[in-house]
Amino acid sequence: MGDVARSNLIFGLHVHVGVPNREEGIRIQNIARYFLPHIYAISTCSPFWEGRNTGFKSFRQKIFAKFPRTGIPSHFNSWADFEQYVNILIKTGTIDNAKKIWWDLRVHPIYPTIEFRICDMPLRIEETLCLAAIMQCIVAKIYKLHQQNISFRNYRRILINENKWRASRYGIDAELIDFGKEIAVPYEKILDELLEFIDDVVDELDCRSKNRVRDF
């Protein structure tokens, strides 16, 4: 991939969370996409590139976006729908396997997990554990809602991308868009809503001691 590959001198945090099966994984992926800018903003710590301050809290994603099949994934109706997409790419010689799909969030093609790939690599182990705990709780909460037949709104990728850009540019100083209310709100309020959303599964997963995002 020429200069695209040569410029890929970046480090990110990848977190795998186990899921019961791939069908459930796709359903979780569809919903969890909405929360990607929320966790991305907390992790932003890559403002410099080639000795310059880029003006972004996280420039790493801008570098990785040069590759194909990156960014926020589209909505898929089912695992079969996703497989059809992969098969088209394989048949046309675009990729040789699904591991060449590098979205910010993906159902892993080999392991029984859903993989979060959006975050910068934190500078402290405490921050890493906190982010991993939040991602685990997001997956558990969405799965719990599915088991209770409670729906959560699916937001379009073009909307989620607006919040991702804001998180990349401003980090925790961003105002993210509340798509339900159609207003921009301070990140702190968005974070409060996320923590409230996952609160009932935090203790079930024994994540309370790790989920200390306010200490960042």
Where do the model's predicted regions map?
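Metal-dependent DNA replication initiation modules
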Residues: 1-13, 20, 26-73, 77
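C-terminal accessory/tail domains of diverse enzymes
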Residues: 3, 64-216
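Conserved hydrophobic/aromatic beta-strand scaffold that supports enzyme active sites
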Residues: 14-16, 113
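Short strand-loop junctions, especially beta-strand C-caps/beta-turns
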Residues: 16-20, 119-121
